Amino acid sequence: MDVLAEEFGNLTPEQLAAPIPTVEEKWRLLPAFLKVKGLVKQHIDSFNYFINVEIKKIMKANEKVTSDADPMWYLKYLNIYVGLPDVEESFNVTRPVSPHECRLRDMTYSAPITVDIEYTRGSQRIIRNALPIGRMPIMLRSSNCVLTGKTPAEFAKLNECPLDPGGYFIVKGVEKVILIQEQLSKNRIIVEADRKGAVGASVTSSTHEKKSRTNMAVKQGRFYLRHNTLSEDIPIVIIFKAMGVESDQEIVQMIGTEEHVMAAFGPSLEECQKAQIFTQMQALKYIGNKVRRQRMWGGGPKKTKIEEARELLASTILTHVPVKEFNFRAKCIYTAVMVRRVILAQGDNKVDDRDYYGNKRLELAGQLLSLLFEDLFKKFNSEMKKIADQVIPKQRAAQFDVVKHMRQDQITNGMVNAISTGNWSLKRFKMDRQGVTQVLSRLSYISALGMMTRISSQFEKTRKVSGPRSLQPSQWGMLCPSDTPEGEACGLVKNLALMTHITTDMEDGPIVKLASNLGVEDVNLLCGEELSYPNVFLVFLNGNILGVIRDHKKLVNTFRLMRRAGYINEFVSISTNLTDRCVYISSDGGRLCRPYIIVKKQKPAVTNKHMEELAQGYRNFEDFLHESLVEYLDVNEENDCNIALYEHTINKDTTHLEIEPFTLLGVCAGLIPYPHHNQSPRNTYQCAMGKQAMGTIGYNQRNRIDTLMYLLAYPQKPMVKTKTIELIEFEKLPAGQNATVAVMSYSGYDIEDALVLNKASLDRGFGRCLVYKNAKCTLKRYTNQTFDKVMGPMLDAATRKPIWRHEILDADGICSPGEKVENKQVLVNKSMPTVTQIPLEGSNVPQQPQYKDVPITYKGATDSYIEKVMISSNAEDAFLIKMLLRQTRRPEIGDKFSSRHGQKGVCGLIVPQEDMPFCDSGICPDIIMNPHGFPSRMTVGKLIELLAGKAGVLDGRFHYGTAFGGSKVKDVCEDLVRHGYNYLGKDYVTSGITGEPLEAYIYFGPVYYQKLKHMVLDKMHARARGPRAVLTRQPTEGRSRDGGLRLGEMERDCLIGYGASMLLLERLMISSDAFEVDVCGQCGLLGYSGWCHYCKSSCHVSSLRIPYACKLLFQELQSMNIIPRLKLSKYNE
């Protein structure tokens, strides 16, 4: 009851007396949903499905390996399993391994894949169980992971953070995420117009065996089928005849009996007449002549052209429509529907929208890995077949034992390479994708979470097309409208909203049964004419025609009832399309859906009673689904529904109610307080900056050794929270600090969004951060029995103390923790042998191996401290030494800060506290912000955040700034007045310099500020003299190499425009790469040391200064037989 009292404690009597009975607590469905589904659950579900179901299907599809050499020999897979992650300690000794150990030791977190097989050896049949064939990288928190089902205490034992989302892989010690990939949906007819306005239809078919794309094109009013196995387009009527529909009347019946449809199809019939094709055989022969010859490796019996054409029609064109024993009925009707759609679209231009989100499917880690594994498994089997074909004929003495020839590393390396490089190239499917995986960004907790919900669409970033980039209305509630990067990837990289779920594939057997029980007439029993009756609807299941139905409304309503009662899977969707007169049932994976509350008789089905039961733990989210209180809708089904946002907007047509409006936004946008008061681009900027804010990354951050880790010294919870912040537990791992802000102008150092910071706050640790870097080194063994070793420090001859470079080394030659390390000092004094290969026979072998020093040195402008040193070994049995280096940095001028409203600014001035203005309660602001940042940016949310934060501090409680809700400004201001502050949040402020009161009241209060990772120390760069490149003798480039600043083409043009020719000469030659050359005045070629090799004389040689790069160019041109000649003339002639 206390919880309820707190919840209702802040309501006024008027609100309590309001007549509408609202389910106030319905947002509690959210934590229940996230408990079941979670933000990363889609990755994990899909991987679990792959490991437990899909992998067995792949094995079933390729279960037998036979050999042409010996018909008696075979190998058959009986079962396949993926084990638990382990590591091989020594030969054949394995032990379970934790993810953290894999991170530290640079190993892959993977589990063995084992199979049960049955095979023949000689004349006996052998069954072997649990035979390993490779290793599978395991996704963290999946069903095969060590972490699954553990309590927080056990997490701590395993050095894992309980808040870490999981859903990524650890490959060679690096955390890798497989991004969600966005595709056009498979097996669906898409009608579109090309650039010239000609309408065509296309289907991308995909089954386990084949993927292919079939197009329907219109040329001069005639219809053609286009496919890349055919050398030219084939008239559609010939295709129908080849499929066994020989009578023209029947063809017309299938396509449509309406006037305009028959008129449009006429020319195609005439064309077939001209080609003199009437029977199925003639048509097949015609197609057989047009088939592209495929060069097959296997000999195999040659097929006739007619057989080849039949095979092609049955298995390659429209692959996903099944053809049993050459019964082409279903495929005919499918083709007819394609033609019909094109004809109908020509008249009133009803083409499909490629960017409509119901036509999209999202591929998750499980689907991508199953494609990859299938490819590798097929390769593995074909290798075995090759070996069998080679070995069986040879050795008749010994029996051929296939187990000895199984190569385990093939599947392992294939998986590891694909995940670590991100290149998915499968030759079978002509699939070649780059950048499928990315390194999990560990800048902050939010950046890791945001990466798990990211969607990457395979679209060229360089093309400036607005279609795929714009925000589609069909993305409402499924994708976050704010969270997309700026620049070239804008709108192509998207993020999931908070409650989105991505479906996985499910069995469609029960659906087919249910549909036929509800009166769907089977497609094989149709004559075709039914398709054009006005009241007959076609029924599609996952893109295949199931049949037709007369009363489609009854079908749809009964289907939904059955789904709500739990007889069918809750993620199956059914939707009607009135323009095409179709009912679509989908049960395939990769559809986006989200839960809604069902509305019955203008009242939501969920009542306060249900919510109390949920709060007390009697019910979980599943119960809401089974009792038909809540259901999932996908994008297509949302079009049939009428969804109310709030309960007071429910009318008689409403079918569903939104659970909470703020779930429209994703994870990153959910952190913003009052985002509905901000201008839209500001929220987008904050989504990008929230991922760069430093804070905490997990409870195990002190045990990790990452390449680069930024931590805030004193992170704080934000004073103004949102519901999202609580749901994703951001307040346990925050990134930022509550700063007291005065909005006023102070000195001239705060123009252009610069901030003025209080020096005393910095001294007390405001914005102070720790930067951790790592250095690592491996000690290898070499083939000739030599190995790397670590030498002790070198001692000075006179003082017997280590020399300066080795000052921090212990006696074992590795730096000791806690020492301060300066630039160019040695961290590990490693030396490696000069000869690492086995020397050739007969050459004189040096007895004692010679060693050369290859020390690991510290490179960095500022000093660091050694936090810890870890000594271990990696998977290749090499010694592995990792050092963690720490720097503590306080904010300085030029460091970047930002509030949660996309208002970024650099620190412009640090002022001692005695010069800062203060209010009459003696509070000095931490930050002074220029008021000019507000008017043009229109971030009213920031103003409200300051008010709510101030009221919260005075009351000692957190306020909510949730999107489309949150604490009301009126209530917050009344709280301020109650504590004796101004209603408007303004204070009377005294100047710190003159001691007189300022002439205006100052808006003053706490705002949550984030420190971003861009610090001046890492970016500052200048150079006077320094290293030069060897080849061109010009200064190197880049800050890390201490490079110069380039004067480029545009700067050169500018100087030419000013006519400053001597400055040009000085910048481009004298300060860069001036060089003295000798030139022969007679032939114009370069001479060397005063002698022209071409003229064989030194009479005309004179010396000039030209850039070295220019000399290099001349010589490179000469080597290609192009001769540049320098013409010299005396300047006074």
Curated annotation (Swiss-Prot):
Reactions this protein catalyses: RNA(n) + a ribonucleoside 5'-triphosphate = RNA(n+1) + diphosphate
Consequence of changing residue 375 to V: In CMT1I; affects RNA polymerase III assembly; no effect on nuclear localization
Listed binding positions for DNA nontemplate strand are 195, 432
- Its main subcellular localisation, reduced to a broad class, is nucleus
Cofactor binding, per record: Two Mg(2+) ions are coordinated by both the catalytic residues and the nucleic acid substrate to enhance substrate recognition and catalytic efficiency.
Residues annotated to bind RNA: 186, 213, 438, 692, 896, 904, 1019
The effect of residue 365 to V is: In CMT1I; affects RNA polymerase III assembly; no effect on nuclear localization
Alphabetical GO biological process terms: defense response to virus; innate immune response; positive regulation of innate immune response; positive regulation of interferon-beta production; snRNA transcription by RNA polymerase III
Cofactors needed by this protein, per the record, are: Mg(2+)
Q: Which SUPFAM superfamilies match?
A: beta and beta-prime subunits of DNA dependent RNA-polymerase
Q: Which residues form a coiled coil?
A: none
Q: Where in the cell is it found?
A: Nucleus; Cytoplasm, Cytosol
Q: What does this protein do?
A: Catalytic core component of RNA polymerase III (Pol III), a DNA-dependent RNA polymerase which synthesizes small non-coding RNAs using the four ribonucleoside triphosphates as substrates. Synthesizes 5S rRNA, snRNAs, tRNAs and miRNAs from at least 500 distinct genomic loci. Pol III-mediated transcription cycle proceeds through transcription initiation, transcription elongation and transcription termination stages. During transcription initiation, Pol III is recruited to DNA promoters type I, II or III with the help of general transcription factors and other specific initiation factors.
Q: What is this protein called?
A: DNA-directed RNA polymerase III subunit RPC2
Q: What is the scientific name of the source organism? A: Homo sapiens
Gene (UniProt) = POLR3B
